[in-house]
């Protein structure tokens, strides 16, 4: 089918309104190979669920090259829960889940409520606000900052760093985006190192 070859994920028209193409992909009824992107497109809920649950599919991190340029970025990703499968994934998930057990969440609840209240107060002061940009996006960032013990002065950097780093999961990443990802990785790692050493 030509559809799998007829769109570009970076095409401004596709980004503006991806829904007609996605609808056609779903109507096709099965995963399709996209030659340019070198990947399978699973557009239906059933296909996506099958892919995510398949034990024969997974992700093992492949370091960015050249390694001297990407050293910090690669270091941050090599032991990421999202980049590993099997026993290593299970071990990492067990470590992370300790931060989200019932007791931890109960202890954090008052602080989370305070963050929610602050964000809602800010939205009220704005009068007109963007629910995503002014509430839904900053909320998890501020909660994660609270979990990690990140200072308010560093907290404002978490989202831009994250956005720059995850850009590397997209297709056709520009040289500027690569530089931004490396810089964000270095700045984030430096912040964590400072926190651990203090």
Model-identified regions with their sequence ranges:
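Active-site substrate-recognition loop segments, prototypically the cytochrome P450 B′-helix/B-C loop
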Residues: 1-132, 141-159, 163-174, 178-185, ...
């Amino acid at each position: 089918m030509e559809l799998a070859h007829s769109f570009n994920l970076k095409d401004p028209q596709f980004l503006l309104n991806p829904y007609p193409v996605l609808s056609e992909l779903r109507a096709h009824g099965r995963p399709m190979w996209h030659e340019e992107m070198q990947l399978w497109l699973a557009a239906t809920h059933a296909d996506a669920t099958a892919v995510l649950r398949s034990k024969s599919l997974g992700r093992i991190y492949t370091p960015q090259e050249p390694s001297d340029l990407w050293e910090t970025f690669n270091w941050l990703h090599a032991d990421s829960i999202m980049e590993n499968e099997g026993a290593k994934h299970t071990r990492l998930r067990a470590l992370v889940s300790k931060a989200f057990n019932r007791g931890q969440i109960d202890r954090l609840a008052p602080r989370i409520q305070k963050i929610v209240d602050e964000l809602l107060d800010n939205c009220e002061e704005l009068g007109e606000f963007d629910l995503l940009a002014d509430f839904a996006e900053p909320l998890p960032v501020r909660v994660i900052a609270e979990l990690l013990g990140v200072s308010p002065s560093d907290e404002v950097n978490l989202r831009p760093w994250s956005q720059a780093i995850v850009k590397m999961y997209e297709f056709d990443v520009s040289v500027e985006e690569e530089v931004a990802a490396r810089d964000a990785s270095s700045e984030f790692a430096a912040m964590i190192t400072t926190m651990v050493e203090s």
